Amino acid sequence: MPCTSTTDINIHYQRKGTGCPVLFLGGVGGDLRSQPNVFASPLAENFDILTFGQRGTGLTDKPDMACTMAQYAQDAAAVMDAVNWDSAHVVGVSFGGMVAQELALGFPQRVRSLVLCCTAAGGAGGSSYPIHELSSLSPAERSRKMLAIGDDRFNEAWQAENAEETERMLKAAAANASPFLSEPGGITGITRQLEARSHHNTFDRLPAIRIPALVCGGEYDRQARPEVVRNLHAQIADAELCFFAG
């Protein structure tokens, strides 16, 4: 996997496909070694996809130091430099959507268009669910909580009434968990991401974004709640809004 260096870390990245350049920014703990990833999606069949392990994840360095969303955006710009991209269409999912906002604000000339999926603006627009507050729960309690946060149709009441199906879903989630979190710095990297996520706030600055934008959300998502997604959308002039039944 190719690597590029910034002033303080080495970043591993991957690029595949042909067509218009698309920078993909994934969620907390994203690891390019985990399968399936973005390259298994239809995107890779139609675009030149570039993505990378954000600091603290995957094969990228994992410094135990506080980091802001703006710094994560600087890392993204550095990866674009590594492949000689002046600009690209940017797709950000969840945490990656927050990084994408900072990239569009801090490096406007480098973002051709913006797709923000299940993410939030923070501040007066509302924030995504504070996942960092779940660290005190047992693994079993946290898994049940995350099931409900991910889709409100599987809330606590539903779980109580559907114990067998709940256990099946929890086992499936455990089977899909990253096998790389036990590596040195794995948990620390995610902790630092969640810290940055908890301070994310672009709400008042978003009107400065003047490029084509699409904001997407899930109707039953409790992590990036529909009202939070709508608030984000309302701050970007002429942005499109789309909700999925999930």
Residue ranges and their predicted role:
Residues 89, 112-115, 207:
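Residue in the alpha/beta-hydrolase core beta-strand immediately N-terminal to the catalytic nucleophile
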Residues 101, 105, 112-144:
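Flexible "cap/lid" loop of the alpha/beta hydrolase fold
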Residues 209, 215-217:
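Short beta-strand/loop motif that positions the catalytic acidic residue
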